[in-house]
Regions:
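Short clusters of hydrophobic/aromatic residues that line enzyme substrate/ligand-binding pockets
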Residues: 72, 78-80, 132, 153-155, ...
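C-terminal substrate-binding subdomain of Rossmann-fold SDR/epimerase-dehydratase oxidoreductases
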Residues: 2, 6-7, 126, 145-259
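Hydrophobic alpha-helix immediately C-terminal to the catalytic Tyr-X-X-X-Lys motif of short-chain
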Residues: 103, 107, 111, 143, ...
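Residue-level signature of the cytosolic catalytic core of signaling kinases
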Residues: 92, 132-136, 193, 242
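A short, amphipathic alpha-helix embedded in the catalytic core of nucleotide-handling enzymes
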Residues: 52, 111, 139, 143-146, ...
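N-terminal Rossmann-like NAD(P)+-binding domain of SDR-like oxidoreductases, especially those catalyzing
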Residues: 1-127, 169, 256
Length: 259
């Protein structure tokens, strides 16, 4: 194999190979990153997606587009099924990610319909695990980093907002399963065990065996108040469901931060 470091928004002159599968995962995914690199985020999910589609078409390969639960925005339907069109602020700050991923889905859908692209779309919900960047700005990485440094946990809003955290190994199993079938999707990949951020802090306190102080800040604009996937489609088509519970996953993640 060969590693190629390449900006996929530029001409892909070095990529002259045939591939069995193209996994298109290129994009910032944490809010601080995609807000900081807003234009780059929109470019990679539009221009970059088109370029990778061309690679897949030339190779006649399976193409897996990594979409996101963010396409549902701040959902008014709960849990979220794949046929829910979402509640997205198209001009809000988060739209650089939400809308560019929705546009990416539109691109993939067009080429699947009109040019027989063998495509699959997966909508990835909140994921965590070892090797998570401690400074990427997502809540689990932030809370663990701050707890290890005996700092107050930064909590935006009142902590009642919910998330459904999926361990990385479970997500990878779902991605591999999607690559082995001809299903287009979209298919939700996430954990159905919903938890509030306040409850997450309690879980971390039980692991660290200490009280964790919090520093409350204003809620972030357009931050979803609830998020939970309906994964019945993934269970039916991929025979997939998460296996790792949150406590075990958090312990593995914390251990990796301490290495």
């Amino acid at each position: 194999f060969k590693f190629i470091e390449q900006n996929i928004c530029q001409p892909l002159e070095e990529i002259k190979y045939d591939f069995d599968i193209v996994f298109h995962a290129a994009s910032p995914a944490s809010p601080p990153k995609y807000l900081k690199y807003a234009v780059e985020t929109m470019d990679v999910n539009s221009i970059g997606t088109r370029n990778m589609i061309d690679v897949a078409l030339k190779s006649k390969s399976r193409f897996i587009f990594f979409s996101t639960s963010e396409i549902y925005g701040d959902p008014l339907v709960h849990p979220q099924k794949e046929n829910y069109f979402g509640n997205v602020n198209t001009i809000g700050p988060r739209s650089v990610y939400d809308e560019s991923k929705r546009f990416g889905e539109a691109l993939v859908s067009y080429f699947a319909r009109e040019q027989n692209l063998n495509a699959g779309i997966i909508r990835i919900f909140n994921t965590y695990g070892p090797r998570l960047d401690p400074f990427d700005g997502r809540v689990i990485s932030t809370f663990i980093r701050q707890a290890l440094k005996n700092e107050a946990l930064t909590l935006h809003g009142d902590g009642s907002q919910t998330r459904s955290f999926c361990y990385i190994d479970d997500l990878i199993d779902g991605i591999v399963s999607m690559s082995k079938v001809s299903e287009f999707g979209p298919i939700n990949l996430g954990n159905i065990n919903e938890i509030s951020l306040n409850e997450l802090i309690v879980q971390l306190e039980s692991i660290f065996n200490k009280k964790l102080a919090t520093k409350n800040l204003p809620a972030l604009q357009d931050d979803p108040m609830q998020r939970k996937p309906d994964i019945s489609k993934a269970q039916r088509i991929l025979n997939w469901k998460p296996k790792v519970n949150l406590i075990d996953g958090l312990k593995l993640t914390i251990n990796s931060f301490q290495i």
